Amino acid sequence: MPRQEPPDFLAGGKSVRIDELNLLVLPDQVTASSALITGEIDYQQYVPFDMIGRLEKARGVNLLGLGGLHMFQGNFRLNHASPPFDDPVVRRVLWKLVDQASMLQAIGVPTRYAVTDCTSFWMCGSPLETKVGAEAFRYSVDAARDELKATSYAGQPVVMLQVSGSILQTAAKVLAQAMRQAGFVVDEQVMDWGTVLARRAKKDGWGLFAVYSNGIDMISPLTHFYVANTCADYPGWSCDKAIPPLLAAFARAPGQAERRRIAEEIQQVAYDLTPAVSWGQFTIPAAYRASLVGLLQSSFPIFWEVSKRA
């Protein structure tokens, strides 16, 4: 029996109001969007950016574009176990080579679905949003070039893993261009996502790759992939021994004010450590037929409380 209260994202009542739910895997996102327009399907989880305009004009179709923790955070994950990013000074140069507005424009995110200057590890629009440490995050190729000259970097190629035909590849190419302008030698290697996962498991043979994550995973130091796994056996192998005790203190904190204070302290250390560099915060909207009633506000599909009008 469901709880007798209104639903609230993953909490609250969970009443089932449909007889059957069919989950379909369609060959590509454009095919899925076309099927939604013709009424062959009722819901599309992620709408490709170049289909948003068409879906907004389609009769009987609504878009669900959310903010805050329901957005996505893009990151470039760095390999701390292998040169040149085993040197923290070299890693920190990248903070000056990422222009989030340009990245998001390049992958086609409409401005209404983008946060173009988010410097918070814990997402913008979240309870822990903070700018502590963010003075390092200032785009300037000239400043990056000067900083790189003062590091141990000796011209060795930086292997950049790229996912073929994806927004991740687009974001990576924008960074690769800026890195070359600053003096890095970049070796762009294109592959599928499965190969990226296999390659990143090794401590050598790669320098960085682009990825994006659901904001729900990134709004807390305890769940942020590249902070929560500090000093763990996790691809990228970033470690600052100051962070694990701070994570433990955050978990024990008695209230929000104390959690926020500790989160700010963790972010300051994380900016110095540079486990990853954010390339932007954005929404990938869902789309659904107007006949669906009761869809909850969520960046992933939740179908309790949903009913379908005839």
Which residues make up each language-model segment?
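Short, solvent-exposed loop/beta-turn-alpha elements that line the ligand-binding surface or hinge
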Residues: 2-18, 55-70, 77-87, 123-143, ...
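A ligand-binding cleft/hinge motif common to bilobed small-molecule-binding domains
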Residues: 47-58, 215-220
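Short helices/loops that flank or line small-molecule/ion binding pockets
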Residues: 30-40, 58, 88-89, 173-182, ...
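Structural transition elements
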Residues: 96, 113-150, 165-170
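Periplasmic binding protein-like
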Residues: 177-229, 262-263
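Bilobed periplasmic-binding protein-like "clamshell/Venus-flytrap" ligand-binding domains
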Residues: 150-167, 208-212, 254-290
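Periplasmic-binding protein-like
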Residues: 81, 85-126, 170-171, 270-278
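Ligand-site clamp/hinge motif
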Residues: 3-54, 176, 185-187
